[in-house]
Amino acid sequence: MGTAKEKKQQIVAEFKDKLSRAQTVIFSNFSGLTVEDDTILRRKFREANSEYKVYKNTLMTIAAKELGYGDDLIKYFEGPTSVAFGYDDPVAPAKVLVEFMKDHKGIELKAGLVNGKLVTVEEIKALAELPSREELVAKALGSMKAPITNLVFVLSGTLRSLLYALNAVKEKKQAEA
């Protein structure tokens, strides 16, 4: 088993890796959460393919400094600090936290990073209002499908009209004969 210093270095390396890989990182104060609420929140993050973890502020400070972040971010590493990471969908962690905060007053947003840029609590809340990646893909596919569907209806209508006209000509010829 490694020494305490080695474990801390490992935690710093893990946090740096997550911080650099994540599209969205949100820092929050979780001091008012019960264990039950925390368990529910962690489950919601897993369901959203996001990650939620608590790190020691001193270790987060070391990692942030090593990655080149300044005091504008580090000042938020005070008091109980939880971290939400969003890797695939940058909106997911913000949606989970903001939605969870509506029913649970024990958690409070501090700040966040979106693609490495520091964002405020207001910007995190605005991010939570955006559609998720899946919703955007569905809308894009729907808008691409609509013109094709309309074209099919127009073409089938034209063919149907042509068939009616040909049928009318045929019936007229038969009536004349």
Swiss-Prot record:
Among its keywords, does the record have Nucleus?
no
Which portions of this protein are annotated as coiled-coil regions?
Answer: none
GO MF, one example:
structural constituent of ribosome
Record-level GO cellular component terms = large ribosomal subunit
Stated family? Belongs to the universal ribosomal protein uL10 family.
Matching NCBIfam families: PRK00099.1-1 (NF000955)
Q: What is this protein called?
A: Large ribosomal subunit protein uL10
Gene name linked to the record: rplJ
